[in-house]
Amino acid sequence: MLAMTKAKAFCQLARFDRPIGSLLLLWPTLWALFLAADGLPNMHVLVVFVLGVVFMRAAGCVINDFADRNFDGHVKRTAKRPMPSGKISEREALGLFGLLVLVSFVLVLTMNTLTIMLSVVGLVLAAAYPFMKRYTHLPQLVLGMAFGWSIPMAYAAQAGELPVVAWLLFTANILWTIAYDTQYAMVDRDDDLKVGIKSAAILFGRFDKIIIGVLQLSTLVTMILIGHSLDLHQIYYWFLLMASGLFVYQQRLIGSREREPCFKAFLNNNYVGMLIFLGIAISVMMQ
């Protein structure tokens, strides 16, 4: 019984019970794989990257909770997490982080040298993000880089090169990530102010909704540029239009700046990523 309780706590620490983060990391990875392959990617590469997304996202959650272990107990949304509640010790958390990183690295060792080299940068970004909340009001920028680093890695693994379009896609993902993670930060803004945690939601203040809108628009413009540069099928743009409709819906949700609607807006971004993926996948398969 004790072992089951501990296993459940480890799963909660790694957020295996909350797949939204994995999905937000997975969609851009799939965008890159399908664009790099100009169709269906190599199956081995696809499986490695999907598994890598799951394990590295879990590792990111573990190190995030380790970094925030002295703050989470003072925040309503995070007070019952495994570390502040005493279910998982600091040593156990670091052990789980090391195990997840090791499994991810074993997976990436089956890729080419360029991909392996890029994975080291990805690990640094993933480990650095949680600590940025102490030093900058834009930890979301670092998160965007960490979440988007799978894009150049995907191009390296699938195509063996890093073309300009890979960095355009990386940029689009950073813009999108800052937008949706600011929505997420709006949920905790009051608590973060009390405990001294920095975030884009605090930095943007009363201009938060406008800046999120600008970031969302910039994401769409960058994705249009990518579609134009690759001469993607017109169906791609119809899916971008549907994604823009979801951005409008999110703006309505965050209008009140209340916790629940802001969190709902954040969760809605899963469908944005999915729509863009479908647009890319269908387009490249039709060409």
UniProtKB/Swiss-Prot annotation:
PROSITE patterns: UBIA. It holds the Pfam family UbiA. GO terms for cellular component: plasma membrane. The chain crosses the membrane at residues 20-40, 43-63, 94-114, 115-135, 137-157, 159-179, 210-230, 235-255, 266-286. Disulfide bonds: none annotated. Pathway: Cofactor biosynthesis; ubiquinone biosynthesis. Its cofactor is Mg(2+). One of its GO terms (biological process) is ubiquinone biosynthetic process. It catalyses: all-trans-octaprenyl diphosphate + 4-hydroxybenzoate = 4-hydroxy-3-(all-trans-octaprenyl)benzoate + diphosphate. It is a multi-pass membrane protein. Keywords: Cell inner membrane, Cell membrane, Magnesium, Membrane, Transferase, Transmembrane, Transmembrane helix, Ubiquinone biosynthesis. Gene3D superfamilies: UbiA prenyltransferase. Its EC number is 2.5.1.39. It is found in: Cell inner membrane. It comes from the Bacteria. Catalyzes the prenylation of para-hydroxybenzoate (PHB) with an all-trans polyprenyl group. Mediates the second step in the final reaction sequence of ubiquinone-8 (UQ-8) biosynthesis, which is the condensation of the polyisoprenoid side chain with PHB, generating the first membrane-bound Q intermediate 3-octaprenyl-4-hydroxybenzoate. This is 4-hydroxybenzoate octaprenyltransferase. The gene is ubiA.
